[in-house]
Amino acid sequence: APDPQPDPQPAPDPNTPLVPDPDKPLEVLDVSALNFGTFLYSGMNWNYWNSKEAPDAKWNSTADLSSWKHGASPLGWGDRDAGTPFTMPAADRAITNYFVRDVNFGTLSADFEVTLDVRVDDGAVIYVNGTEIKRVNMPEGTIDANTRASSNVGLTTAKNKLVRITVPRKLLKDGVNRIAVESHANYAKASSVTFDLTASLVR
């Protein structure tokens, strides 16, 4: 009798996000073929740095991210729906956590537009290619890893009041662009510090 054939493997569910290898850097997200629509969803993967030690000074522009961790959003602590919960003891939590995603937009038109919707809990500074484009609930002046958010923001408020930002066209370039966010707690033992971001484009 002929050898039995193995059962066919089911096709992957296109709605299931791919889980990257935790031991390899997160790949650049290629959206060069997308003409319009959302390209970063809640639940997608981000590089993150959640150590009390500050990352490389060029973390938001050109720094190598191979030593960073990565996981699905939302990321942080205090949110039971977190895709990547930060489970370290409260004493080891950092005031500031850093999040990065590199995106290949391909060739850009003069009218190319990117819009971000950011969850801010408690404060945040948002960058594109190393240039600050928005700070929310943060003090003026120089920001560093020990800078606290200006006030506490509850998790429910953060989830329901996303901050919308249109990225200045002059900051975007052909090829790979870096979207980066630093999230700041209002105090060391804040009950929640979480990050999430969705983004859309129009060519």
Placement of each model-derived feature along the sequence:
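Short hydrophobic beta-strand segments in globular cytosolic domains
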Residues: 133-134
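Surface-exposed, low-complexity/disordered Ser/Thr/Gly/Pro/Asn-rich loops and linkers
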Residues: 64-100
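Aromatic-lined ligand-binding clefts that engage carbohydrates, nucleic acids, or primary amines
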Residues: 46, 68, 95, 103, ...
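Conserved aromatic beta-strand anchor motif in extracellular beta-sandwich/beta-rich domains
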Residues: 128-130, 199
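Ser/Thr/Gly/Pro-rich low-complexity, disordered linker/stalk segments of secreted
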Residues: 1-29
